[in-house]
């Protein structure tokens, strides 16, 4: 029987009548179902976040730090379950999934230590210039499918630390691990501070145009980023857009072809190449072009492509059919 996962709204795990299937990209089998949220559920999540903000914005920063550390601890304590689940929905090999899970735990712990103290840029006889960071309000976080857990934490922890509350939307392709984390932290974070809802891509525009959301943080494609900027312009929402890259590798003639071949391969094909900083262009000096090209081919032959859950797999499947096509 397929496991049905629930959303986190106002401190409670809730569901909807309609569900979305989540598929293992290696086997193409349905491995879970998640709520198909629409405007009504979004309104509930935003209302919960708005209500929680009234208290959370005044919560002492040490208590906010403690709540973030509780999230970090929950991820670390359940790391094996989480990285196996992540592999099943995203496709990346276990060692890479393990790196993402432990990386998310470490990132949240590190972000809990960031300083929000006032910064004095001038203190003279005639002028005092001070920068003070104040909570923005309710944040909408929209997360991609290539690093779903890392990107979720990268949005949740800073929002919490700064005194904001958040409504997070995972990708419909990879929501399971994030929802499992939601279940683990539901009793560790004050109700409404973190809300996690799932839905089709159509849920995103409802978030970006919602009148009671103050800031949007998005990681994904440049094309979608443009649409978010357009939607946010109606009421001048604050936005943070982390969009696709176009990274290059440049190889000089004194490089060791055998050593560089391995580095170039993984800079391009780690996570099946589904990384914004993946090398998409390679410039090789003509003096070593042939030798390095041959070395890359030979190294690629040693890498196993397959199910990320199988031991020895180096490169997992492309995550979804749209990306594959």
Language model feature labels by segment:
Residues 1-127, 315:
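N-terminal Rossmann-like NAD(P)+-binding subdomain of aldehyde/semialdehyde dehydrogenases
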Residues 23, 220, 284:
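A conserved hydrophobic position in a structured secondary element of the catalytic/binding core
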Residues 27-33, 213, 250, 304-305:
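Conserved C-terminal structural/oligomerization subdomain of aldehyde/semialdehyde dehydrogenase
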Residues 28, 64, 86, 163, ...:
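Residue-level signal for inorganic ion chemistry
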Residues 46, 65-72, 83, 105, ...:
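Hydrophobic face of alpha-helices
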Residues 53, 57, 72-79, 83, ...:
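Structural signal for hydrophobic packing residues in well-ordered secondary-structure cores
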Residues 119-259:
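Rossmann-like NAD(P) dinucleotide-binding subdomain of oxidoreductase/dehydrogenase enzymes
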Residues 223-325:
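ALDH superfamily catalytic-core signature
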């Amino acid at each position: 029987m397929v496991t049905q996962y629930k959303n986190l709204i106002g401190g409670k795990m809730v569901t909807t009548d309609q569900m979305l299937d989540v598929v293992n990209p290696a086997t193409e089998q349905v491995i879970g179902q998640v709520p198909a949220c629409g405007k009504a559920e979004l309104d509930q999540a935003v209302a919960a976040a708005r209500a929680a903000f009234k208290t959370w914005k005044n919560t002492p920063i040490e208590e906010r730090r403690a709540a973030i550390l509780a999230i970090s601890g929950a991820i670390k304590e359940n790391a094996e379950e989480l990285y196996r689940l992540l592999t099943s929905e995203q496709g990346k090999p276990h060692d890479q999934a393990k790196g993402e899970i432990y990386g998310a735990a470490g990132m949240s712990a590190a972000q809990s230590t960031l300083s929000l103290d006032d910064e004095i840029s001038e203190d003279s006889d005639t002028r005092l210039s001070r920068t003070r960071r104040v909570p923005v309000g309710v944040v909408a976080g929209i997360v991609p499918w290539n690093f779903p857990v890392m990107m979720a934490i990268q949005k949740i922890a800073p929002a919490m630390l700064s005194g904001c509350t958040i409504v997070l939307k995972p990708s419909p392709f990879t929501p399971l691990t994030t929802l499992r984390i939601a279940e683990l932290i539901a009793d560790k974070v004050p109700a409404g501070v973190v809300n996690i809802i799932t839905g089709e891509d159509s849920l995103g525009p409802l978030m970006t145009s919602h009148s009671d959301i103050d800031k949007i943080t998005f990681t994904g494609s440049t094309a979608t980023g443009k649409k978010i900027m357009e939607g946010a312009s109606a009421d001048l929402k604050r936005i943070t857009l982390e969009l696709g890259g176009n990274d290059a590798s440049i190889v000089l003639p004194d490089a060791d072809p055998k050593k560089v071949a391995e580095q170039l391969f993984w800079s391009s094909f780690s996570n099946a190449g589904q990384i914004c900083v993946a090398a998409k262009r390679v410039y090789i000096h003509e003096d070593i072009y042939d030798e390095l090209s041959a070395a890359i081919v030979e190294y690629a032959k040693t890498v196993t492509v397959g199910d990320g859950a199988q031991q020895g797999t180096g490169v997992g499947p492309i995550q979804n059919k749209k990306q594959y096509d």
